[in-house]
Amino acid sequence: MLAKRIIPCLDVKDGQVVKGVQFRNHEIIGDIVPLAQRYAQEGADELVFYDITASSDGRVVDKSWVARVAEVIDIPFCVAGGIKSVEDASQILTFGADKISINSPALADPTLITRLADRYGVQCIVVGIDTWYDTESDSYQVYQFTGDEKRTKATTWQTEDWVKEIQLRGAGEIVLNMMNQDGVRNGYDLRQLQQMRAICHVPLIASGGAGTPDHFLEAFRDADVDGALAASVFHKQIINIGELKKYLSEQGVEIRVC
């Protein structure tokens, strides 16, 4: 059995790490490189960086900080933000990232997933899904351009259908960003995770809602996700990664303990 992963998420805007609630009202958390170093030292298994306005701004992620991060940490990291071509991905991987993640650009052009997977291998290609639970229809809807409150919009994709589609196209890993739970720290959407786990045959990462160590445990135990991504509980030092992993190990979760 592969070890479960704890993955701090760093949303980047204007060169700094920020954090919002339900993808809105972002506050500045701090500088990118020191935070990356801190999480690596605490025992994170990998890091994910989202340049949250790159796609809506029509640009690719700023590569200068990617290179700086690669110099100071020794764990894998994934970068997302406006990657629309094989050339964009090549630059980010050349600057030191281990994986690239695409979200809105994949919705605009699903063939991008296949082209990237063919060039770099599926192990390098992560697809992020921003998913919103609509209470009226009792369904999960995929959203696009969520880094910009003015441009955020629902797509025609139901989350379950998009999960199936991107696997066919070559996604090597899926990060499910559950927008209703984002930043509110009341737990991952286990119902949604269980539904998607049943149809997901590549590594599935839960994102959105972690507030306590038990929330991580529930995601691993009850939804069998491969990794749990979180931001505010780590940024605000509510949960220490080393202590979290010790707790999870004590509860029988297969995890790399620092």
Swiss-Prot record:
One of its GO terms (cellular component) is cytoplasm. Belongs to the HisA/HisF family. Pfam families: His_biosynth. It catalyses: 5-[(5-phospho-1-deoxy-D-ribulos-1-ylimino)methylamino]-1-(5-phospho-beta-D-ribosyl)imidazole-4-carboxamide + L-glutamine = D-erythro-1-(imidazol-4-yl)glycerol 3-phosphate + 5-amino-1-(5-phospho-beta-D-ribosyl)imidazole-4-carboxamide + L-glutamate + H(+). InterPro entries: Aldolase_TIM, His_biosynth, HisF, IGPS_HisA/HisF, RibuloseP-bd_barrel. Gene3D superfamilies: Aldolase class I. One of its GO terms (molecular function) is lyase activity. Keywords: Amino-acid biosynthesis, Cytoplasm, Histidine biosynthesis, Lyase. Pathway: Amino-acid biosynthesis; L-histidine biosynthesis; L-histidine from 5-phospho-alpha-D-ribose 1-diphosphate: step 5/9. It is found in: Cytoplasm. NCBIfam families: hisF (TIGR00735). GO terms for biological process: L-histidine biosynthetic process. Disulfide bonds: none annotated. It comes from the Bacteria. IGPS catalyzes the conversion of PRFAR and glutamine to IGP, AICAR and glutamate. The HisF subunit catalyzes the cyclization activity that produces IGP and AICAR from PRFAR using the ammonia provided by the HisH subunit. Its main location: cytoplasm. This is Imidazole glycerol phosphate synthase subunit HisF. Its EC number is 4.3.2.10. It comes from Yersinia pseudotuberculosis serotype O:3 (strain YPIII). Heterodimer of HisH and HisF. The active site is at 11, 130.
